[in-house]
């Protein structure tokens, strides 16, 4: 193997390591975003269970609308996490 070929192989290996590291970080971030979303949904569920909210139709309607927004956002976060996990798994298979 020539020096040029060896240098190319080293660069290729370094890029692969950097890509793997970036994918692992993306998975960690996506997982944290899901956890944060779950906490937000749980906190909003507690708010909706208070007498102040459920006894007031306007507040209850606004809370229900916000709850649905939080649930939709959580679903998007789960999809992002799943996509990140799949990308990492594919990269690990091709290693």
Residue spans for each PLM region:
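Charged, heptad-repeat coiled-coil alpha-helices that serve as long linker/dimerization "arms"
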Residues: 1-95
